[in-house]
Amino acid sequence: MTSSQDACYISLLGLAEYFRTSSPPNIKKCIQCLQALFTFKPPLKVEARTHLQLGQILMAYTKNTELARNHLEQAWMLSENINNFDDVKFDTASLLAQLYQQQEQSSLAKPVLRKAIELSQHNVYWHCKLLFQLAQTHATDKEYALASELLAVGVESTDESNATYLKSLFLLSRAMIMMIERKSSDVLAILNQAGTIIDNAIQNIHLKEYLKVFFFVLQVCHYLQLGQVKTVKTSLKQLQQSIQTIMAPNWPSDEQIFGQNSTEMFMWLPKEQLYVLVYLVTVSHSMMAGYMDKAQKYTEKALTQIEKLKSQENKPILAVFQIILLEHIIMCRLVMGNKSLAIKEIALAKDVCLSSSHKFLLKKHSPQLHCLLGLYSMSASLFDHAERQFYTCIQETTERDLKLFANLNLAIVYLRMKREPDLRAILDQVQQENSLCSNSQALMGSFYYVQGLNAFHKSSFHEAKRFLRETLKMANAEDLNRLTSCSLVLLSHVFLSIGNSKESMNMVTPAMQLASKIPDIHVQLWGSAILKDLHRMLKEPALEQEAYNNHLNFSQNLIADQLKCTKFQEHTLINWIQGDPPMPMLTTQEPMMGEPSQAAAMRVAAGAPGQQVIFQ
């Protein structure tokens, strides 16, 4: 460039920045200034940098992704083979790959990132950043083996550069991928390796605490994935202590902690998001342990925190947290007999999914929404709708646990509909698919429970006792309170059916105590019906009347809630089977067409064996 060209270049850059930072920003003039630079036929480095700047501006301030893509592709083509041009070259590759991802063209993103990784081996920061990005791209496409391989390359590269903090991040990220792949033994081995490094080799106390939160989140999720609710308690307590340390007022800001040197600028999640995540795993634990009140309390706190963060900056991950929390709280509502809140929250979850960019969340969570609608329909005794929803969930999902969960509830639906061949087919399929897999203790205990329930309905009482004792053994080992209460009340009904009133009373008493603690209205409804019959057999009229009054109270609450549900517009969601769900709807008080609501409600209140749904 000549000196006059140089002066024009600097002036145009200054003007572009002035327009960008004006209040409000004048992006059109900013872009015009940058485009004017090309009239001076600048050197390759200047041309490449300008194309990158235009791509950045267009992505940040406009919806013109095609023009942004064009500029970034130009910047990548120009900078790819220029030496000593790392920031522009690799920033371009990273941003271009990100744009391809947004356009759902990951097949274009991967070769760009692979080439950039190959060119960045001399630069630890960019090499690791690009490895993480490519691993994330493969993970998003469910290519977990490739993602794991890239993270293993990251571990090796940090060994060469002695970047211990980065090595811990690569190890923990790889453990997370292994969890998705259900490689339990590999997860434990990698977590143990990472834990040793965090404890002994990380000197910076602030970085150490962040890594501990990441480590304990994974450890807690690993135990919960295996249904080990009791085993996880120590790790969960340590996680809660670590997050309290990070959230303390005297703790430095993320900017201070992660800005010291290039190999320590990587952060898994900012502390405000970690705070929500810890609430989320605590909710998951409370739900599995059968503490619905606790789960509700922590969910409300987490959702409040999410709304606060959204008002500051609406990051996409906040919607992910919100949808998972809603999925948990909906199951809590159904257990507690509050279907009217559950269907409202299912509709809210649906709206959150629809509002996400490119309906990304809907693609990920459509099976879960169908499963929740199946549970809602099932709890309302709308078995035809429940069947269709569970079947859709099973067809759509690729997650083994969700498929097993939906199949077990579908089995109960077939049991209630007296469809023995379909029930048998599901039980055989579950047995076959899960005989060689390490499954969640909670889900496998539920499988034995469903078999016990089936045996009870066939009056095979000895077989029912055998299955239910197996369920109780698994449930008691890990404090799975809801599974315990369901098994006890069914076992009590088994003993009542064979005339053993003493054993029946011994089972139903702790079942009712647990059910009131959870609280689980369906077990309480069932248990109060058993108690009424037991006290009549034992000629205890006062206690029989008390049990009858309790049963009537539970029944009336369920009937009232059921009648309320059928008047909600959201109730029509049970008819959504394929495609996108209906857009956000206004609540109406008009009653639904279809089955008379009173008849449906009465079926719910009947308290028949197996009415309660299974939840993880």
UniProtKB/Swiss-Prot annotation:
Any one cellular-component term (Gene Ontology): SMC loading complex
Keywords: Cell cycle, Cell division, Chromosome partition, Mitosis, Nucleus, Repeat, TPR repeat
Domain of life: Eukaryota
InterPro entries cross-referenced by the UniProt entry: MAU2, TPR-like_helical_dom_sf
Subcellular location per the Swiss-Prot or TrEMBL entry: Nucleus, Nucleoplasm
BP GO terms, sorted: cell division; chromosome segregation; maintenance of mitotic sister chromatid cohesion
DNA repair found in the keyword field: no
TPR repeat extents: 90-123, 445-478, 485-518
Location, primary (coarse class): nucleus
A Pfam short name: Cohesin_load
Family to which the UniProt record says this protein belongs: Belongs to the SCC4/mau-2 family.
Binding partners and assembly: Component of the cohesin loading complex.
Role, per record: Required for association of the cohesin complex with chromatin during interphase. Plays a role in sister chromatid cohesion and normal progression through prometaphase.
Protein name: MAU2 chromatid cohesion factor homolog
